[in-house]
Amino acid sequence: MITLNTEEKIFIYSWLKNILSHELTEQQLQQYQQGVFTPLFDFLSEQDLAKQINTVRNSLMQLSNLPLAHLELAADFAQLFLLNGENSALPYASAYLSEKELNQHIAFIDHLLFKYQLKFDHNLREPSDHLAVYLELLITLEKSGQKEKSFNFIQHYLLAWLIPFNKKVQKIKTETSFYQAITEILITLLNKNVKLS
């Protein structure tokens, strides 16, 4: 059974946001392969996520046998998230919502960004319907201790499009299943969070 306190949720959501926002650098991948994240993986395995973590670990082992591992993983990231909507699972709400739903989402997201005075690195140039923006807002809501608002945000704003997003991610064939496992971890945690509310 998944049981996370607020600090653990914030840490894990931050980790997921960072890993799904951009490709891992060669140095970051080396940290994974050198066991820096072993305590986190062990913890998540104890939270009913052993299957997904095993896939992550197997993918890292697979990459360790390749001469340009970080480029292979970057290619997986690009294949999954950066091509067109036909060939990739774009990490934008606009790719999965109707125009009416999207307008409601954008209005609410922009309201929260203004309310919490959140600003993003302009070098990223991500619009407000990007997954990283949604996760940053969820982290902010968790930090503020507003559990009811967090649950509402997950149920009505995140899962509304992340479920079809994840289904598409799982169907795309890549060299490793690293990112497929990561998105599955995210969806599982969000679903459990809502069910425990």
Curated annotation (Swiss-Prot):
Q: Where in the cell is it found?
A: Cytoplasm
Please list the disulfide bridges: none
GO biological process entries: protein complex oligomerization; protein folding
Q: Which UniProt keywords apply?
A: Chaperone, Cytoplasm
Q: Does the keyword Chaperone apply?
A: yes
Main subcellular location of this protein, as a coarse class: cytoplasm
Among SUPFAM superfamilies, the record links this protein to: TorD-like
- Name the GO cellular-component terms: cytoplasm
Pfam families attached here?
Nitrate_red_del (PF02613)
PANTHER family on file: CHAPERONE PROTEIN TORD, CHAPERONE PROTEIN YCDY
* Function summary: Involved in the biogenesis of TorA. Acts on TorA before the insertion of the molybdenum cofactor and, as a result, probably favors a conformation of the apoenzyme that is competent for acquiring the cofactor.
Family annotation (HAMAP family): TorD
By sequence similarity, the record places it as follows: Belongs to the TorD/DmsD family. TorD subfamily.
What is the protein name for this chain? Chaperone protein TorD
* UniProt source species: Histophilus somni (strain 2336) (Haemophilus somnus)
* Taxonomic classification: Bacteria, Pseudomonadati, Pseudomonadota, Gammaproteobacteria, Pasteurellales
User: What gene does this protein come from?
Assistant: torD
